[in-house]
Amino acid sequence: MHTKNLFYSRTQQITQYLSALLMMVILTRTSISSAYPLFAQQGYENPREATGRIVCANCHLANKPVNIEVPQAILPDTVFEAVVQIPYDLQLKQVLSNGKKGGLNVGAVLILPEGFELAPPDRISPELKEKIGNLYFQSYRPNIKNIFVVGPVPGQKYTKITFPILSPNPANNRRAHFLKYPIYVGGNRGRGQIYPDGSKSNNTVFNATASGRVKKIIRNQKGGYEIIINDGSDSNEVVNLLPPGLEPLVSEGESIKLDQPLTSNPNVGGFGQDVAEVVLQDPSRVQVLLFFFASIILAQIFLVLKKKQFEKVQLTKINL
């Protein structure tokens, strides 16, 4: 009986250990390989709020520029480029989740008007394929064809991201019209500062959770620090944990206040959003416009010829 209980206890311990190990692997892979698109997709049905704010800004707190370039006008059922630029200093290094320094990744979310979608591979020209490179565009939702995310990808290689877009044809799509449409984009470089559950990453400032005097600063073997704050009473101590990659600004014996920064801000990245407009042009209107321009040019030519003919007649009368 004792042997059976011991076997059951050991089995339970091994199961718990393997479960914890598996969870750590999943979390580690998630945070590295699919951080920002995954967080947005899991937490929000639509990446653009009613206020116009793109939800990526909830985790990436710093504001940085992002630009999008599209043609001014396009014809129905036509493939065109939407070029997203995410500029930053390529020499910068960020704090990684393990506390080490590394290069910045970039990512983007593109919100197209309804009816616009990603161009199928057989419609993409070789020149456009070369601009796209090895990027993989993922639908924000399986049933949504006009919102796409890409990344994280190495920023050293992809500060410019080219999306191949296929315009709708109002003749086949009743929801499409010959109008001016907005295209929204959000792009970030670097890791976020806040996780979806509200907890901080090691890529942001950590503040004191209590006022008092710094009693002790302990450096952990696996990285990070424990800052022990005494609030004035002998028995009440508050421990502030700093994750790996952050260095304390305070020292032992120093008096600090509530919410005082314990670290500097390590973040070198940020998020930004932009909007561009594209006109879905009616081909018949283009033909009418071309005919109008051609008629004006012909009228000008006939006017010049008529003027020269009149001058010849006048010159002949003078000679007579």
Swiss-Prot record:
InterPro entries from the entry?
Cyt-f_TM, Cyt_f, Cyt_f_lg_dom, Cyt_f_lg_dom_sf, Rudment_hybrid_motif
Coiled-coil segments, which residues?
Answer: none
Going by the UniProt record, its keywords in alphabetical order are: Electron transport, Heme, Iron, Membrane, Metal-binding, Photosynthesis, Plastid, Signal, Thylakoid, Transmembrane, Transmembrane helix, Transport
Question: Which organism's genome codes for this protein?
Answer: Cuscuta gronovii (Common dodder)
Listed name of the protein: Cytochrome f
Q: Does the keyword Chloroplast apply?
A: no
**Is Transport there in the keyword field?**
yes
The record lists the lineage as: Eukaryota, Viridiplantae, Streptophyta, Embryophyta, Tracheophyta
**Complex and partners:** The 4 large subunits of the cytochrome b6-f complex are cytochrome b6, subunit IV (17 kDa polypeptide, petD), cytochrome f and the Rieske protein, while the 4 small subunits are PetG, PetL, PetM and PetN. The complex functions as a dimer.
- Free-text function comment from the UniProt entry: Component of the cytochrome b6-f complex, which mediates electron transfer between photosystem II (PSII) and photosystem I (PSI), cyclic electron flow around PSI, and state transitions.
